[in-house]
Amino acid sequence: MKKIIALFMCAAMLLCFAACGNSEQILVAEKESAGESVACENEDFADYTYTAVDTQAKALMEVNAGTADAAIVDYVMSIGSIGAGTDYEGLVIDGEGYSEEEYGIAFRKGSDLTAKVNEIIRDLKTSGELVNIAKNYKLDGILLGDEKSEAFAQAETDSDYEYVMNKGTLVIGITYFAPMNYENEAGELVGFETEFAKAVCAKLGVEAVFQEISWSAKETELAAKNIDCIWIGMTITEEREENMSISIPYMQNKQVKVVKSK
């Protein structure tokens, strides 16, 4: 119901914006993302016509191709995707950004695995291993991972921890976007979250198995046990905390407007 109301409000605001603005500028963002919320709710974009796209990568492609005038994407994504030395050298961030937020890993509601992973995140941060991984992708300045949480205690019934340990794998739902999860020139899966997840799994003593999923189907995939966690640069929100078990925050983020450099 919340999602339906939110979508209705978004549509209403977009109609209002379209009525008030005379510009034909096109704004794009990933469907059902934090970027879409900014596009729908922020008055800075009242003169834009908004169009949803499948992925953040597609949003940047549209701006680069000239089929859109601006995109709203994660600041984290922009670090590895635009500017000098990237495929989108002609794209830049316009302004200071919107919607300060934090990333977390999502597990099934009530999962005892969350507390165990929280312990490992803090250990990796304290040892410096997580910082070193972040430095490889120029993300160390926005790294978190120090927050306290409940101590791990294995559940007596329906233990996700036991389930994962018995099968020896942690199936991780991902989407592809640099610098979090992407393929290098050799076709190997790399990225901050890829290395981070492997480090956590090494501490758990299980194999990290990465499975690409659709952003819009992430909750369904998790509930159906097609994946064991959602690890895709996911913003922590009250609604998600109500429906899933979320790890401690591991990275700061914000939404930014990306345009072609002048």
Language-model segments: residues:
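Positively charged n-region of N-terminal signal peptides that target proteins for export
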Residues: 1-9
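C-terminal motif of bacterial Sec signal peptides marking the signal peptidase cleavage site
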Residues: 16-19
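Bacterial signal peptide processing site
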Residues: 21-23
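Extracytoplasmic small-molecule ligand-binding "clamshell" domains
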Residues: 42, 49-53, 60-62, 74, ...
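A bilobed periplasmic-binding-protein/Venus flytrap-type ligand-binding module shared by bacterial periplasmic
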Residues: 100-120, 256-262
